[in-house]
């Protein structure tokens, strides 16, 4: 792979040697399981005529990546193996975005990779769910997959980074009595040699799990790059443990559960680094601006509202630039998105920012909002209702999703509810963009228009 020998890690060997019909892998991010899925399915398709495998991913891009990996693995097999008995490099029959197949008909073996859909029905095949905990309607798809493995030696494999202590992935991973048929693999970051200081890898395999505290573990065994990744979570310990330590987040105090968040995540929506200037809106556009307080970051969120009452997040951007640079960026973003409403956190430093926006951005509906417990409670409860009824969606933006899950509802001494999270700038930017002061945005003229 990538012109270098492909060496299997111990956890990959364990997985490939697991002959269970039902397998579950609870894993860290970026540890190479897409490659292992590709390797296992290519090997089977190469040596077993009429073999079928169906790989289900969270979106079309992820699905296409699996086929690309399978193709690369196939082409890495030396041509000399085409003449072996049996041939270990069979004829490549199909090589499309969603399918790769080997052997000539009528004994063609195929690997089909698709985004999550009911297309998993029909035919005897091996089924692989990749990032299962992040798939919308996972229970429905899981049930639809069962008939495909009923006969013969077909198998079902579920692989994912974890989310919260809820949902089918958590149930199967944690409840051995209810799902005794599953083998279970837990793979945290310290089992992946790419994330561990080379001379400490063997020690990490033996002792890292016994270290108390994620930060201490990262400092003791992690590479410099992993240190940067850990610091990038900005103190969100639960987020790091979920993404890299195969730990399920406690749902007991979460106001928004992971099940709810996943079902509102549209993984086909692009995660944009910059706003797409060619985007043509079919509704009206609002922008929420949560301004930085001391060590926090400012977050801009662009939302499209449709006539049917639905809303979807199109774009988010965080920054710690100086305020004058943030203001210049907001002006550019308003022009590019043709925003109908801009709602800014007017609390504290936001007062001057909001006044400048109203004065210097003519023709734009700018409103400032002072945060109060009452406003936050109204937004959070309205938002939860919109999530439950499917009226709001967003791309798979990790910071946004983690912060939504991090919001806790606690009761104050004054008997009011308080909504907050350890890091919540993305969340409040989202609330400002979605709801603002609650007034219906009007169609406005735009900067630069006459």
What are the roles of these predicted feature ranges?
Residues 51-72:
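Conserved Walker A/P-loop ATP-binding site and its immediately adjacent core
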Residues 88, 136-224, 353-360, 365-368:
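ASCE P-loop NTPase helicase motor core
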Residues 194-289:
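ATPase catalytic-site recognition across NTP-hydrolyzing enzymes
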Residues 68-125:
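Inter-Walker segment of RecA-like/P-loop motor cores
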Residues 139, 243, 247, 251, ...:
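C-terminal nuclease/phosphodiesterase catalytic domains that cleave nucleic-acid phosphodiester bonds
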Residues 20-41:
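Walker A/P-loop
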Residues 1-22:
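Pre-P-loop entry segment of helicase/translocase ATPase cores
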Residues 103-105, 188, 273-281, 296-346:
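Nucleic-acid-processing active sites and adjacent nucleic-acid-binding tracks
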């Amino acid at each position: 792979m990538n012109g270098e020998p492909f060496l299997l890690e111990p956890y990959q060997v364990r997985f490939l040697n697991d002959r269970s019909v039902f397998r579950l892998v609870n894993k860290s991010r970026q540890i190479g399981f897409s490659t292992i899925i590709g390797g296992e399915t290519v090997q089977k398709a190469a040596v077993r005529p009429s073999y079928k495998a169906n790989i289900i991913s969270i979106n079309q891009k992820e699905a296409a990546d699996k086929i690309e990996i399978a193709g690369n693995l196939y082409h890495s097999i030396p041509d000399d193996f085409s003449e072996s008995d049996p041939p270990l490099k069979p004829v490549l029959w199909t090589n499309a975005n969603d399918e790769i197949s080997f052997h000539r008909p009528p004994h063609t073996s195929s690997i089909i990779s698709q985004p999550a859909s009911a297309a998993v029905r029909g035919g005897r095949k091996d089924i692989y769910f990749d990032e299962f905990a992040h798939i919308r309607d996972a229970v429905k798809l899981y049930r639809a997959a069962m008939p495909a493995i009923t006969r013969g030696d077909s198998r079902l494999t579920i692989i994912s980074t974890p989310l919260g202590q809820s949902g089918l992935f958590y149930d199967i991973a944690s409840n051995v009595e209810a799902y005794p048929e599953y083998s279970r693999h837990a793979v945290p970051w310290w089992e992946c040699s790419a994330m561990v200081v080379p001379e400490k890898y063997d020690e990490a395999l033996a002792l890292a799990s016994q270290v108390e505290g994620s930060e201490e573990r990262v400092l003791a065994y992690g590479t410099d790059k992993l240190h940067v990744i850990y610091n990038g979570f900005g103190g969100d310990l639960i987020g790091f443990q979920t993404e890299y330590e195969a730990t399920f987040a406690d749902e007991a105090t979460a106001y928004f559960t992971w099940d709810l968040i996943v079902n509102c995540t549209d993984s086909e929506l692009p995660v944009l680094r910059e706003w797409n200037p060619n985007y043509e809106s079919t509704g009206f556009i609002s922008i929420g601006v949560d301004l930085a307080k001391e060590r926090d970051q400012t977050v801009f969120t662009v939302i499209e509202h449709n006539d049917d009452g639905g809303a979807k997040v199109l774009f988010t951007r965080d920054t710690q630039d100086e305020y004058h640079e943030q203001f210049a960026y907001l002006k550019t973003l308003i022009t590019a998105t043709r925003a109908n409403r801009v709602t800014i956190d007017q609390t504290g430093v936001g007062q001057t920012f909001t006044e400048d926006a109203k004065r210097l951005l003519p023709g734009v509906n700018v409103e400032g909002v002072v945060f109060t417990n009452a406003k936050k409670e109204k937004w959070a409860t309205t938002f939860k209702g919109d999530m439950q009824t499917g009226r709001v969606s967003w791309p798979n933006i990790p910071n946004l999703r983690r912060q939504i899950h991090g919001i806790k509802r606690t009761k104050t001494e004054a008997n009011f509810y308080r909504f907050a999270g350890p890091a919540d700038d993305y969340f409040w930017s989202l609330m400002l963009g979605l709801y603002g002061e609650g007034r219906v945005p009007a169609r406005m003229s735009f900067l630069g228009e006459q």
